[in-house]
C-alpha cells in the first residue's frame, strides 16, 4: 500500500497497523521523516513494522518499480467512478490512499490503472485517513479470501 504524501506520523502508524493486519505485503511512503517521527510511527503502529516492510522512497521510483514489476495501481480518490468492491484488488496491486489535505497526487493519479471512490452520504467531504485505508485494505483481504475458497 502507498500512503501518498501522508504527513502525520500518528496517522501513518495507525494505517501501517491496518495494512499489516489486513495482509498487505509492504507499506510505501513517499515522504521524508526524521528519526523522531519514525519512532512515533513505530509506536502508533504497535510495532507492526516488525512484520511488514515499511519502505521510504520517492514517487518517481515507486511508480517506475510498480510498473516494471507488473503491479496495477488502484488509487482511492473522490474522482473515482466506482467502489473498491467493483474493482479486482487481488494479485499484484498497489493500493493508494492520499494525504490528509491534498489527497492522491496528480502524478500517482496519472499512473493509476483505476481510481475508486469510497461512497459518502454526509456533509463532511472526506473520511479520516485511517477509515479510508481500512475500507480498502479489508475489501482487498475479502477478495483474496473469496478467491481461496
Q: How would you label these PLM feature ranges?
A:
Residues 12, 93, 105, 134-137:
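Alpha-helical structural signal
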